[in-house]
């Protein structure tokens, strides 16, 4: 698909594991990237609740491995794609992503202050759910509607932030271009959406009606399954309410987040 759309752009797909020291060294040594967009992560909240070690291995140590190689091979910019679930996390996935954020920011500050040798600028971008991405609710709801229902929602009051894939990609790239190093960028997600309203709209867009107490002859029923392990009713984008500043881009803000000294953090993680 990429080569069809951009036939003149060289494209080299490389399969690898972000946890593998040897594989990451091979990739950085052979291709010498100028910019790294680090999006590799386990993001499924309930699965990570029952597999915490894997969440830490990939989301934390995988990030460390890629970031360290970026410094080693002189990458100009390293853009980490994070999540709103890293803010005041209540689940393993969110906590692992927050720890990855702290590592990236601490490494960036250590380089800036001359405590670590390197020139790489590290940036973190934090946003919510991406419509149509793997594991998102839209494809699942559509499949449930095609199968005649019911459409399953965890809680009637659960809300989430959403943006489209093109929006997310564009804002991440723009944030990477704006970075000075150590920045945590918050992407404007607009207003949060109630998941049950999203489900109802998808039913109606499919030319069907919702079956409920007000419409017993409707086509598709919506059922509530209960919050899953580690799941919040709502997500946040900021750890503190007053730590955000505007940037030159109307949809990108920067936040001042707490972090640990790099040496202290490295010692803890290596243990």
Feature annotation, model-predicted:
Residues 13, 55, 78, 122-125:
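Hydrophobic/aromatic anchor residues within beta-strands of the central parallel beta-sheet
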Residues 32, 40-45, 49-102, 106, ...:
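Conserved Rossmann-fold NAD(P)-dependent oxidoreductase catalytic core, especially the SDR/UDP-sugar
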Residues 66, 106-271:
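Strand-loop microenvironment adjacent to phosphate/nucleotide-handling motifs in alpha/beta enzyme folds
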Residues 14-15, 57, 224:
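Conserved residues in the N-terminal Rossmann fold of short-chain dehydrogenase/reductase
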Residues 29, 71-72, 146, 177:
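Residue-level signal for alpha-helix termini/capping positions
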Residues 12-35, 230:
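Conserved Rossmann-fold cofactor-binding substructure of NAD(P)-dependent oxidoreductases
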Residues 19, 86, 130-132:
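Conserved sequence/active-site signature of Rossmann-fold short-chain dehydrogenase/reductase
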Residues 2-8:
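Short, conserved SAM-binding/catalytic segment
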